Curated annotation (Swiss-Prot):
Organism of origin: Pectobacterium carotovorum subsp. carotovorum (strain PC1)
InterPro entries: ApaG_domain (IPR007474), ApaG_sf (IPR036767), Uncharacterised_ApaG (IPR023065)
Protein name per its UniProtKB record: Protein ApaG
GO biological process: error-free translesion synthesis
Gene it is expressed from: apaG
Taxonomic superkingdom: Bacteria
Length: 125
């Protein structure tokens, strides 16, 4: 059994009304992600994979190196936080995915990003 480093991911999403155009089926959402290293050694975030699903069930996959132009090294007991965004065609959707990371010995591992909702405030009860 391989012991992957302990990394926690927390997400908060919000609707960006000022950049959205509902009449044109353009709904802009931002999300802030905090990646915490709960382990005893540093880890590095090298890339990400996203599965974005709109309210009609249409899915888009996005993958790439780093996050917001960085490949941060996260030291034990510390965190890396960033804000990014997504544009979908419906007022409701979801995102989920994973990060590609390496441990202090250069061994690759993945950290899941739990599914989170993209929703305009009037849809949340």
């Amino acid at each position: 059994m391989i012991n992957a480093p302990r990394v926690c991911v927390q997400v908060q999403s919000f609707y960006v009304e000022s950049q959205s155009e509902p009449d044109e089926e353009r709904f802009v959402f931002a999300y802030t992600i905090t990646v915490r290293n709960l382990g005893r050694h540093e880890v590095q975030l090298l890339g990400r994979y996203w599965l974005i699903t709109n309210g009609n069930g249409r899915q888009t996959e996005v993958q790439g190196e780093g996050v917001v132009g960085e490949q941060p090294i996260i030291h034990p007991g510390s965190e890396f936080q960033y804000t990014s965004g997504a544009v979908i065609e419906t007022p409701l959707g979801t995102m989920e995915g994973h990060y590609h990371m390496t441990d202090h010995q250069g061994k690759a591992f993945q950290v899941s990003i739990p599914v989170f909702r993209l929703a305009i405030p009037s849809l949340i009860h």
